[in-house]
Protein backbone atom coordinates (compact mmCIF):
# COMPACT_ATOMS: atom_id res chain seq x y z
CA UNK A 1 0.00 0.00 0.00
CA UNK A 2 1.35 3.42 -0.95
CA UNK A 3 -0.05 6.92 -0.65
CA UNK A 4 -0.83 8.48 -4.00
CA UNK A 5 0.68 11.82 -3.00
CA UNK A 6 2.39 13.51 -0.08
CA UNK A 7 0.29 16.64 -0.62
CA UNK A 8 -3.22 15.59 0.37
CA UNK A 9 -5.09 17.74 2.95
CA UNK A 10 -4.23 15.77 6.08
CA UNK A 11 -0.70 17.21 5.88
CA UNK A 12 -2.04 20.63 6.82
CA UNK A 13 -2.88 19.16 10.20
CA UNK A 14 0.26 17.04 10.37
CA UNK A 15 2.54 19.99 9.76
CA UNK A 16 1.25 21.57 12.94
CA UNK A 17 2.64 18.54 14.82
CA UNK A 18 5.87 18.24 12.85
CA UNK A 19 8.04 18.63 15.95
CA UNK A 20 6.68 15.35 17.35
CA UNK A 21 8.54 12.11 16.62
CA UNK A 22 7.36 8.54 17.13
CA UNK A 23 9.74 6.93 19.68
CA UNK A 24 10.73 3.94 17.54
CA UNK A 25 13.24 1.49 19.01
CA UNK A 26 14.90 -1.71 17.82
CA UNK A 27 13.02 -4.95 18.49
CA UNK A 28 14.89 -7.01 21.10
CA UNK A 29 14.23 -10.17 23.11
CA UNK A 30 13.34 -7.98 26.09
CA UNK A 31 10.31 -6.62 24.19
CA UNK A 32 8.42 -9.91 23.99
CA UNK A 33 5.80 -9.12 26.63
CA UNK A 34 5.12 -5.64 25.25
CA UNK A 35 4.70 -6.82 21.66
CA UNK A 36 2.69 -9.97 22.39
CA UNK A 37 0.35 -8.02 24.70
CA UNK A 38 -0.93 -6.40 21.49
CA UNK A 39 -0.58 -9.21 18.96
CA UNK A 40 -2.15 -11.97 21.04
CA UNK A 41 -5.36 -9.94 21.50
CA UNK A 42 -5.52 -8.99 17.83
CA UNK A 43 -7.39 -10.69 14.99
CA UNK A 44 -4.38 -10.20 12.73
CA UNK A 45 -2.84 -13.44 11.46
CA UNK A 46 0.16 -12.19 9.48
CA UNK A 47 3.26 -14.27 10.13
CA UNK A 48 5.17 -10.95 10.17
CA UNK A 49 3.65 -10.29 13.60
CA UNK A 50 5.17 -13.40 15.19
CA UNK A 51 7.61 -12.21 17.84
CA UNK A 52 10.06 -14.86 16.71
CA UNK A 53 9.99 -13.62 13.12
CA UNK A 54 10.32 -10.00 14.22
CA UNK A 55 13.51 -10.81 16.13
CA UNK A 56 14.97 -13.49 13.87
CA UNK A 57 14.71 -11.38 10.72
CA UNK A 58 15.64 -8.02 12.22
CA UNK A 59 19.17 -8.36 10.80
CA UNK A 60 17.65 -8.04 7.31
CA UNK A 61 14.88 -5.49 7.88
CA UNK A 62 16.19 -3.31 10.75
CA UNK A 63 12.75 -3.66 12.32
CA UNK A 64 11.73 -1.09 14.92
CA UNK A 65 8.55 -0.66 16.94
CA UNK A 66 6.75 1.83 19.15
CA UNK A 67 3.52 2.12 21.10
CA UNK A 68 1.46 5.11 19.97
CA UNK A 69 -1.98 5.95 21.41
CA UNK A 70 -2.77 2.32 22.32
CA UNK A 71 -1.46 1.01 18.99
CA UNK A 72 1.61 -1.11 18.29
CA UNK A 73 3.39 0.20 15.19
CA UNK A 74 6.34 -1.13 13.20
CA UNK A 75 8.72 0.34 10.64
CA UNK A 76 11.39 -1.50 8.68
CA UNK A 77 13.43 -1.39 5.50
CA UNK A 78 12.65 -3.69 2.56
CA UNK A 79 15.83 -3.09 0.62
CA UNK A 80 15.92 0.67 0.08
CA UNK A 81 12.19 1.08 0.69
CA UNK A 82 11.07 2.30 4.11
CA UNK A 83 7.91 0.42 5.02
CA UNK A 84 5.42 0.15 7.87
CA UNK A 85 2.94 -2.46 9.05
CA UNK A 86 -0.72 -1.80 9.67
CA UNK A 87 -1.00 -0.61 13.30
CA UNK A 88 -2.18 -3.21 15.83
CA UNK A 89 -4.51 -2.05 18.58
CA UNK A 90 -7.74 -0.21 19.30
CA UNK A 91 -8.60 3.46 19.18
CA UNK A 92 -8.25 6.25 16.63
CA UNK A 93 -6.59 4.40 13.74
CA UNK A 94 -6.78 7.43 11.47
CA UNK A 95 -4.73 9.56 13.86
CA UNK A 96 -2.04 6.88 14.15
CA UNK A 97 -1.87 6.48 10.37
CA UNK A 98 -1.35 10.21 10.05
CA UNK A 99 1.56 9.99 12.46
CA UNK A 100 3.12 7.18 10.43
CA UNK A 101 2.69 9.15 7.21
CA UNK A 102 4.39 12.10 8.86
CA UNK A 103 7.21 9.83 10.05
CA UNK A 104 7.77 8.72 6.45
CA UNK A 105 7.79 12.34 5.30
CA UNK A 106 10.50 13.18 7.84
CA UNK A 107 12.51 10.26 6.43
CA UNK A 108 12.04 11.75 2.94
CA UNK A 109 10.22 8.57 1.94
CA UNK A 110 6.89 7.89 0.29
CA UNK A 111 4.54 6.24 2.82
CA UNK A 112 4.34 2.48 2.18
CA UNK A 113 2.77 -0.35 4.16
CA UNK A 114 3.48 -4.03 3.51
CA UNK A 115 1.51 -7.08 4.65
CA UNK A 116 -1.88 -5.40 4.21
CA UNK A 117 -4.70 -7.96 3.92
CA UNK A 118 -8.08 -7.48 2.22
CA UNK A 119 -9.92 -6.60 5.43
CA UNK A 120 -7.27 -4.01 6.25
CA UNK A 121 -7.70 -2.51 2.79
CA UNK A 122 -11.37 -1.93 3.55
CA UNK A 123 -10.42 -0.13 6.77
CA UNK A 124 -7.88 2.07 4.99
CA UNK A 125 -10.34 3.00 2.25
CA UNK A 126 -12.95 3.90 4.85
CA UNK A 127 -10.54 6.05 6.86
CA UNK A 128 -8.72 7.79 3.99
CA UNK A 129 -10.80 7.14 0.85
CA UNK A 130 -8.98 7.40 -2.44
CA UNK A 131 -5.60 8.21 -0.90
CA UNK A 132 -3.88 4.85 -1.37
CA UNK A 133 -2.86 2.56 -4.21
CA UNK A 134 -2.92 -1.19 -3.50
CA UNK A 135 -0.67 -3.78 -5.15
CA UNK A 136 -1.20 -7.52 -4.58
CA UNK A 137 1.86 -9.77 -4.34
CA UNK A 138 0.92 -13.41 -3.85
CA UNK A 139 4.56 -14.40 -3.43
CA UNK A 140 4.27 -13.04 0.11
CA UNK A 141 0.87 -14.55 0.95
CA UNK A 142 0.47 -16.68 4.08
CA UNK A 143 -1.11 -20.13 3.91
CA UNK A 144 -3.77 -20.60 6.59
CA UNK A 145 -5.11 -24.05 7.50
CA UNK A 146 -7.49 -25.36 10.12
CA UNK A 147 -5.60 -27.29 12.76
CA UNK A 148 -8.27 -30.00 12.60
CA UNK A 149 -7.52 -30.51 8.90
CA UNK A 150 -3.78 -30.97 9.42
CA UNK A 151 -4.18 -33.14 12.52
CA UNK A 152 -6.66 -35.56 10.90
CA UNK A 153 -5.95 -35.27 7.15
CA UNK A 154 -9.50 -36.31 6.32
CA UNK A 155 -10.85 -35.95 2.82
CA UNK A 156 -9.71 -36.33 -0.76
CA UNK A 157 -7.56 -33.19 -0.81
CA UNK A 158 -5.20 -34.72 1.78
CA UNK A 159 -4.92 -38.13 0.09
CA UNK A 160 -1.36 -37.51 -1.16
CA UNK A 161 -0.23 -36.44 2.29
CA UNK A 162 -1.83 -39.51 3.88
CA UNK A 163 0.02 -41.68 1.36
CA UNK A 164 3.37 -40.14 2.33
CA UNK A 165 2.62 -40.64 6.03
CA UNK A 166 1.53 -44.26 5.55
CA UNK A 167 4.71 -45.06 3.63
CA UNK A 168 6.77 -43.40 6.36
CA UNK A 169 5.04 -45.43 9.07
CA UNK A 170 5.43 -48.68 7.15
CA UNK A 171 9.11 -48.03 6.45
CA UNK A 172 10.00 -46.66 9.90
CA UNK A 173 7.54 -48.23 12.37
CA UNK A 174 9.80 -47.42 15.34
CA UNK A 175 10.12 -43.70 14.61
CA UNK A 176 9.91 -41.33 17.57
CA UNK A 177 8.55 -37.81 17.97
CA UNK A 178 9.96 -35.66 20.77
CA UNK A 179 9.58 -31.97 21.65
CA UNK A 180 12.48 -29.61 21.07
CA UNK A 181 14.21 -29.04 24.41
CA UNK A 182 17.48 -27.20 25.17
CA UNK A 183 19.50 -30.43 25.04
CA UNK A 184 18.19 -31.16 21.52
CA UNK A 185 18.95 -27.80 19.90
CA UNK A 186 22.34 -28.94 18.62
CA UNK A 187 20.96 -31.88 16.67
CA UNK A 188 18.50 -29.50 14.97
CA UNK A 189 21.44 -27.26 14.06
CA UNK A 190 23.31 -30.29 12.71
CA UNK A 191 20.40 -31.33 10.48
CA UNK A 192 19.99 -27.74 9.28
CA UNK A 193 23.70 -27.60 8.38
CA UNK A 194 23.42 -30.85 6.43
CA UNK A 195 20.27 -29.63 4.67
CA UNK A 196 22.04 -26.42 3.68
CA UNK A 197 25.05 -28.31 2.37
CA UNK A 198 22.80 -30.37 0.09
CA UNK A 199 20.81 -27.31 -1.02
CA UNK A 200 23.78 -24.92 -1.36
CA UNK A 201 22.27 -22.35 1.01
CA UNK A 202 25.34 -20.16 1.16
CA UNK A 203 25.28 -19.67 -2.61
CA UNK A 204 21.76 -18.19 -2.59
CA UNK A 205 20.76 -15.00 -0.83
CA UNK A 206 17.26 -16.19 0.06
CA UNK A 207 18.23 -19.48 1.67
CA UNK A 208 21.29 -17.87 3.23
CA UNK A 209 19.09 -15.31 4.98
CA UNK A 210 16.66 -18.02 6.02
CA UNK A 211 19.54 -19.97 7.53
CA UNK A 212 20.69 -16.98 9.55
CA UNK A 213 17.16 -16.39 10.89
CA UNK A 214 16.71 -20.09 11.71
CA UNK A 215 20.01 -20.35 13.59
CA UNK A 216 19.14 -17.23 15.61
CA UNK A 217 15.76 -18.73 16.50
CA UNK A 218 17.27 -22.03 17.66
CA UNK A 219 19.91 -20.27 19.75
CA UNK A 220 17.18 -18.17 21.42
CA UNK A 221 14.45 -20.80 21.43
CA UNK A 222 13.05 -20.31 24.93
CA UNK A 223 13.53 -16.53 25.03
CA UNK A 224 11.48 -16.21 21.84
CA UNK A 225 8.70 -18.41 23.23
CA UNK A 226 9.01 -21.06 20.55
CA UNK A 227 7.55 -24.58 20.55
CA UNK A 228 8.78 -27.37 18.31
CA UNK A 229 9.21 -31.05 17.62
CA UNK A 230 11.73 -33.56 16.26
CA UNK A 231 11.38 -36.84 14.36
CA UNK A 232 13.92 -39.57 15.04
CA UNK A 233 14.53 -42.73 13.03
CA UNK A 234 16.92 -45.24 14.59
CA UNK A 235 17.83 -42.57 17.18
CA UNK A 236 18.89 -40.14 14.43
CA UNK A 237 17.13 -36.84 13.76
CA UNK A 238 15.40 -36.80 10.36
CA UNK A 239 13.13 -33.74 10.70
CA UNK A 240 12.29 -30.84 12.97
CA UNK A 241 9.81 -27.98 13.06
CA UNK A 242 8.98 -25.03 15.29
CA UNK A 243 6.73 -22.00 15.61
CA UNK A 244 4.71 -19.90 18.03
CA UNK A 245 1.28 -18.28 18.39
CA UNK A 246 0.65 -15.23 16.21
CA UNK A 247 -2.57 -14.33 18.00
CA UNK A 248 -5.14 -15.94 20.30
CA UNK A 249 -6.40 -18.33 17.61
CA UNK A 250 -3.59 -18.68 15.06
CA UNK A 251 -0.31 -20.58 15.40
CA UNK A 252 2.52 -19.83 12.98
CA UNK A 253 4.66 -22.77 11.85
CA UNK A 254 7.87 -20.95 10.98
CA UNK A 255 10.23 -23.76 10.01
CA UNK A 256 10.07 -27.33 8.73
CA UNK A 257 13.33 -29.08 7.82
CA UNK A 258 13.78 -32.74 6.95
CA UNK A 259 16.25 -35.20 5.52
CA UNK A 260 15.15 -35.45 1.88
CA UNK A 261 16.44 -39.02 1.74
CA UNK A 262 13.71 -40.05 4.19
CA UNK A 263 10.48 -40.31 2.21
CA UNK A 264 7.52 -38.83 4.05
CA UNK A 265 9.57 -37.04 6.70
CA UNK A 266 8.14 -33.62 5.84
CA UNK A 267 4.56 -34.85 5.85
CA UNK A 268 5.10 -36.77 9.09
CA UNK A 269 6.65 -33.91 11.07
CA UNK A 270 3.83 -31.62 9.94
CA UNK A 271 1.19 -34.15 10.99
CA UNK A 272 2.77 -34.93 14.36
CA UNK A 273 3.28 -31.25 15.20
CA UNK A 274 -0.29 -30.35 14.22
CA UNK A 275 -1.49 -32.89 16.78
CA UNK A 276 0.63 -31.34 19.53
CA UNK A 277 0.38 -27.59 18.99
CA UNK A 278 -0.64 -26.03 22.32
CA UNK A 279 -4.27 -24.97 22.54
Where are these regions (language model features)?
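Short, low-complexity S/T/E/D/G/P-rich linear segments that nucleate or cap local secondary structure
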Residues: 2-6
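Amide-forming acyltransferase catalytic core, primarily the GNAT-like/NAT-type
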Residues: 8-11, 15-69, 204
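Conserved donor-binding loop and adjoining core beta-sheet/short helix segment
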Residues: 37, 47-119, 232-260
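Conserved GNAT-fold acetyl-CoA-binding loop/helix
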Residues: 46-49, 200-215
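Short, glycine/charge-rich beta-strand/loop segments that flank catalytic centers
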Residues: 110-127, 138-142
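A structural signal for short, well-ordered beta-strand segments and their strand-loop junctions
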Residues: 110-116, 144, 176-181, 230
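Acyltransferase donor/substrate-recognition loop-hinge adjacent to the catalytic core
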Residues: 130-204
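Accessory, usually C-terminal, subdomains that scaffold auxiliary metal cofactors
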Residues: 209-279
Amino acid sequence: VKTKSLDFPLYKELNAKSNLMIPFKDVTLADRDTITSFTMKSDRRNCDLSFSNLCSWRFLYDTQFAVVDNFLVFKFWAGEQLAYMMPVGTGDLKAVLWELIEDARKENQHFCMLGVCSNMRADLEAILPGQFTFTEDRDYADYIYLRSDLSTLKGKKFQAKRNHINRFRNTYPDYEYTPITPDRIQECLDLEAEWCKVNHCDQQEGTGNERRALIYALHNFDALGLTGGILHVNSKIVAFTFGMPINHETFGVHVEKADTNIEGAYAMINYEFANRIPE
